[in-house]
Amino acid sequence: MPPKKHSGFMMFVNEWRDNNPEGRNLSIAQAVSRCGSIWEKMTAQQRGPYNSGAKNADVLTRVKKERLNCHGQVLSQVELEEREMAESQINMKRCTERIVMDAKRSHDLENTKFVFVAFNYFTKALTTDVYVPAEFSASEYSFNEGIMSVYSTLIDPGQIIFGQGSDAQHHSSTTHNLPLPPNALGEKNMGKLYRNILEYLSKIQEGKDATKPFVVFTKTDMVPVVKSCFRYLACENQDGSYENGDQIQVLDIQYLLFILKKEVLDIAGVSDEKINLYVTDAYFLKDFFEFTPEISCQYHEENDRSKYCTQSLVMRWAYTFSDYMCSDLAISVQPGKHIPPKTKPNYRFYRQPPAGDHLHHPLTCQQTILRLLATLTRKTNFHLSVGGEPPTVALVPSDLTLWDPGIYPLTPVPFMTFLTTTLV
């Protein structure tokens, strides 16, 4: 049965009992009998407050009847938020797919520009999704050109959320190690910084529809942080058109990597059956360039925290994209653009082909192999014989093995087998 509605008359009876000493000694039935004659003589204006109070009581009763979860949250509200989150995720994926497919249809995927962004923050509000920014970086990237430009700045918000100094200090000491306000470094004018970011994005995405937002990409777990930090900067901007920070749309870089890999393989005519989001996420999160030197800002380079530097992050993401897909597009990588400026040689060894076949290596690969063999000669007690036309190699211990990272990851290849292979 539905709950009984409150009546204005009973609201009046309860008030009369509370305010009159005589009414406190009467039962409900006696009080109703006594107040009935008084209620009949009251005008509509006098009865109005009691009738309004009864309606308000009905509303409160309905609210109290809402089902709650184990955290005391209204289930209907939680379900609404979950639906909105799911819709937001679907919209983000559709937008990413549309960007990639448009570039593919125009046969210009190699020159399409992507902007990677990252924020460091001091602290997060306990009850809301407000993050106080500490550092920002962005990089402009394309497959053909690699990293085309980088924007990086430290941020001094002036103050942190009251009562969260300890949390901010702990977060800083375990991650970016930036000094807290009022000793923070970098730009103090949030509105100016936001305008500078918009100006940087407008130069990259020149010719964009003015009614559409700028599109940037960041890690999956950093999407809410980046969105919140952009809103934080925008709210202090004097230009009302940027008030809500809606001019920048933040998308998932890990989903971008997945979609790009599938489309790149399709362009190359290679099967993508083994490519799924779990595979590309695992590759991205390995962060092969995590300890690359001299790509972070000066502060983090000097304090040995380059791993957490946002400038290092956005550059490492670009290197990851190049390392994962440039070979599929037959794009030669350039140090400082597609890969770090200082990179150790990556020697790749290939299995011996069937009898009668030959491995075809460019001259640079032959020279690399011969150089490596000479190095191994100095490190062992065996003599290696390198010579002939075409060059051949022999006299190597049969139990010596090397890894073949190019073709069979984590599979040992007998070095003797490789060295007796004819190189052409």
From Swiss-Prot:
**DNA-binding residues (ranges):** 2-69
Q: Which InterPro entries match?
A: HMG_box_dom_sf, Maelstrom, Protein_maelstrom
Q: Which Gene Ontology MF annotations are present? A: transcription cis-regulatory region binding
Name a biological process GO annotation. piRNA processing
Keyword match Transcription regulation: yes
Assigned keywords, A-Z: Cytoplasm, Developmental protein, Differentiation, DNA-binding, Meiosis, Nucleus, Oogenesis, Repressor, RNA-mediated gene silencing, Transcription, Transcription regulation
Enumerate the Pfam families for this protein: Maelstrom
Q: Where are the annotated coiled coils located?
A: none
Where found, per UniProt? Cytoplasm; Nucleus
Is tRNA-binding among this UniProt entry's keywords? no
Identify one Gene Ontology CC term for this UniProt entry: P granule
Transmembrane residue ranges: none
Q: Which family does this protein fall into?
A: Belongs to the maelstrom family.
Describe its function.
Involved both in the piRNA and miRNA metabolic processes. As a component of the meiotic nuage, plays a central role during oogenesis by repressing transposable elements and preventing their mobilization, which is essential for the germline integrity. Repression of transposable elements is mediated via the piRNA metabolic process, which mediates the repression of transposable elements during meiosis by forming complexes composed of piRNAs and Piwi proteins and governs the repression of transposons.
The entry's protein name is: Protein maelstrom 1
What organism is listed for this UniProt entry? Drosophila ananassae (Fruit fly)
